[in-house]
């Protein structure tokens, strides 16, 4: 938040939390900004390795999870540049409260999607998503420090632009194709 010339205060946009201000020994500082924190949702397709990412306010909620799941399934504005869409047969998640919520389970049931909740302490079960998070952090978010982000919509537009670039140009080591090339081979 910064002061304007007329004395009013306005938000200065999204920014990284300072580690010395927000850490485990200062929980009240974290609680104050809880609803303003930006949460990243990352999903992948197992066969192609395609990565999807979106950002949300409000934490890990069933509403945010359902919105992200629908975002992953729906056709994007330009399906030639971003062909990733469709209803999966199965979704694999960790046992978080949003992931096991009635809202998400009902959405999946209505779409005939099997929900596989991984057992706690089995990190290999979600290794692909962990690697996708690493890729998002190093290949996309690391460059955000050079960009002034004004709102979450701008952040999501940048994320979509990056996803089209990354999924469309970077070859996956497992199958030797770009993620979108592999996606387009799925029948």
Residues covered by each model-derived region:
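Short catalytic-loop micro-motif centered on adjacent basic/acidic residues
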Residues: 55, 90-94
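Active-site beta-loop-alpha junctions of metal-dependent nucleic acid enzymes
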Residues: 54-82
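Mobile-element integrase/transposase regions
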Residues: 1-42, 75-78
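A generic secondary-structure signal for well-formed alpha-helical elements
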Residues: 72-80, 95, 111, 115, ...
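RNase H-like two-metal-ion nuclease catalytic core shared by retroviral integrases
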Residues: 93-94, 101-111, 115-141, 153-156, ...
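Active-site-proximal acidic segments at structured loop/helix or strand boundaries
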Residues: 139-187
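Short, glycine-anchored, charge-dense loop/turn motifs used at functional sites
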Residues: 47-50
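A general structural motif
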Residues: 86-88
């Amino acid at each position: 938040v910064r002061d304007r010339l007329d004395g009013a205060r306005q938000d200065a946009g999204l920014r990284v939390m300072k580690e010395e201000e927000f850490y485990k020994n200062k929980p009240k500082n974290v609680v104050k900004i809880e609803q303003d924190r930006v949460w990243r949702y990352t999903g992948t397709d197992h066969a192609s390795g395609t990565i999807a990412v979106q950002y949300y306010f409000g934490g890990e909620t069933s509403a945010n999870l359902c919105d992200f799941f629908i975002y992953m399934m729906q056709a994007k504005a330009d399906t030639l540049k971003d062909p990733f869409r469709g209803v999966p047969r199965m979704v694999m998640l960790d046992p978080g409260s949003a992931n096991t919520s009635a809202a998400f389970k009902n959405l999946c049931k209505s779409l005939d999607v099997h929900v596989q909740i991984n057992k706690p302490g089995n990190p290999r079960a979600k290794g692909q998503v962990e690697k996708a998070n690493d890729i998002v952090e190093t290949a996309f978010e690391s460059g955000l420090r050079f960009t002034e982000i004004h709102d979450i919509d701008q952040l999501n537009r940048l994320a979509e632009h990056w996803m089209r670039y990354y999924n469309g140009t970077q070859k996956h080591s497992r199958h030797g194709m770009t993620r979108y090339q592999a996606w387009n081979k799925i029948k």
